[in-house]
């Protein structure tokens, strides 16, 4: 009985020439020659390239099944690994046996027929789009990046903490949250003042899907010193753009005794680590993106890992923008939140490198960010990358209880809702810092794929929760 091997192992020479092997996968294409041969391109998702299987017409099911194979059919091919005479592939399979495990019922109506499909069309058949070159490549890159993130933090002595998806706290204070409830919408219980009585709900209070694992992460950082979260987060933001999702994944490290400078260094080290990993491990997929999606993909990543990060205070960045002579769609003045055009000007035109903008006005940042001595700014930072703008947002956290309480009061937040978060400042409080990285935005940057809905398996967005 021949051994079963993944196609990537066969193509990378891990199976010896002359050895008989079995590969299992799906037909990408079939072509027939007048010499009584058929050539099957078979892929199994283990790498970008399919393997070519050469099938002689003396195979017993050649007429009955092989000549009926079309794109998408599933097959198990057993054959001898031989050197390929044609360009582009070092080896191919000389088939000895081909078992068809599944035909495509109607090739004429198969949504993934062998032709080029628009990325917009593929979103309508999200259950089948992993079979395409582009989504297959995105999926392998996504896996590579996630593994590299876990590896980086593990090597740096961090612990991964699973923070809850259901919460009663609003980390961002923005109120754009999905409510979680088991109450009967047709017969809602009401209190005396006519408001919904959430005390009768499943959790006994108003509850939501989390917008961030940060607050929970801080509790563990104040015990384990270095932790990170990596999981799904949710925003009920009614934004139908190429940059927004209602459900997305966040990477959120949190470090006790860390300053804003430590935070910026951690962000730089992490990004460079994961970019080096994807350049080394997913060269085949990146070459596809370079050829068909964004010609600058590989160059951009190589430049990133070889660049020193620039740093600039928000106030100085505003001066740079005002003196640039450039007409921006959104006017520049001290106190604004930088828009994407401002961020990209700084990273792409002014610094021509990744840049950390730090010390933002307190009024545009969250309540938990540490108030600076000037009383006007907080120890916040954004990492801006050429080609996309903001890729990471973070801060040193406010460790002084009285200052935290004052900030919450200014923002109209009820301290009682955050009693456990305030406890961290009562019992052995320490300076600590952390940041958030939108994982899908990272994948957009790495692949050059323009719409964030194409880098997550099943995108969730306004009026879109199919599949």
Swiss-Prot record:
It comes from Haemophilus influenzae (strain PittEE). PANTHER family: ASPARAGINE--TRNA LIGASE, MITOCHONDRIAL-RELATED, ASPARTYL/LYSYL-TRNA SYNTHETASE. This is Asparagine--tRNA ligase. It catalyses: tRNA(Asn) + L-asparagine + ATP = L-asparaginyl-tRNA(Asn) + AMP + diphosphate + H(+). It is found in: Cytoplasm. Pfam families: tRNA-synt_2 (PF00152), tRNA_anti-codon (PF01336). Its main location: cytoplasm. Keywords: Aminoacyl-tRNA synthetase, ATP-binding, Cytoplasm, Ligase, Nucleotide-binding, Protein biosynthesis. The lineage of its organism: Bacteria, Pseudomonadati, Pseudomonadota, Gammaproteobacteria, Pasteurellales.
């Amino acid at each position: 009985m021949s051994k079963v091997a993944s196609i990537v192992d066969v193509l990378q020479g891990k199976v010896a020439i002359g050895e008989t092997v079995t590969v299992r996968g799906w037909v990408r294409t079939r072509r027939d020659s007048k010499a009584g041969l058929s050539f099957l391109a078979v892929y199994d998702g283990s790498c970008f390239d399919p393997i070519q299987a050469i099938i002689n017409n003396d195979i017993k099911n050649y007429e009955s099944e092989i000549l009926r194979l079309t794109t998408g059919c599933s097959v198990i091919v057993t054959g001898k690994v031989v050197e390929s005479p044609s360009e582009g592939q070092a080896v191919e399979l000389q088939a000895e046996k081909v078992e068809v495990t599944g035909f495509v019922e109607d090739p004429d109506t198969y949504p993934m027929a062998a032709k080029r499909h628009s990325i917009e069309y593929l979103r309508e058949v999200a259950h089948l789009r992993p079979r395409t070159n582009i989504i297959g490549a995105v999926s392998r890159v996504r896996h590579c990046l996630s593994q590299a993130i876990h590896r980086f933090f593990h090597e740096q002595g961090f612990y991964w903490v699973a923070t809850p998806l259901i919460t009663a706290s609003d980390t961002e204070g923005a109120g754009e949250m999905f409510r979680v409830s088991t109450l009967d919408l047709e017969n809602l219980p009401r209190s005396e003042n006519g408001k919904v009585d959430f005390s009768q709900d499943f959790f006994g209070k108003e509850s939501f899907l989390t917008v961030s694992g940060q607050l929970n992460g801080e509790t563990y950082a104040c015990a384990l010193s270095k932790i990170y979260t990596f999981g799904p987060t949710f925003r009920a933001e009614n934004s139908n753009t190429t940059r927004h999702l209602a459900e997305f994944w966040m990477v959120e490290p949190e470090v006790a005794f860390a300053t804003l400078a430590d935070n910026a260094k951690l962000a730089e080290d992490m990004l460079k680590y994961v970019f080096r990993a994807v350049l080394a491990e997913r060269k085949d997929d990146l070459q596809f993106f370079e050829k068909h999606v964004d010609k600058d993909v590989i160059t951009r990543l190589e430049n990133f890992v070889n660049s020193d990060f620039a740093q600039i205070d928000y106030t100085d960045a505003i001066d740079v923008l005002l003196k640039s002579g450039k007409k921006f769609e959104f006017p520049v003045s001290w106190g604004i939140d930088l828009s994407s055009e401002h961020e990209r000007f700084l990273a792409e035109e002014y610094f021509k490198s990744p840049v950390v903008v730090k010390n933002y006005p307190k009024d545009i940042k969250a309540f938990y960010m540490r108030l600076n001595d000037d009383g006007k700014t907080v120890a916040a930072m954004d990492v801006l990358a050429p080609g996309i703008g903001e890729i990471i947002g973070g801060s040193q956290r406010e460790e002084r209880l009285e200052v935290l309480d004052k900030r919450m009061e200014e923002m109209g937040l009820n301290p009682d809702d955050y009693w456990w978060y305030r406890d961290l400042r009562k019992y052995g409080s320490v300076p600590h810092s952390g940041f958030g990285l939108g994982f899908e935005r990272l994948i957009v940057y790495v692949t050059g794929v323009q719409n964030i809905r194409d880098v997550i398996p099943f995108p969730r967005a306004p009026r879109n929760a199919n599949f």
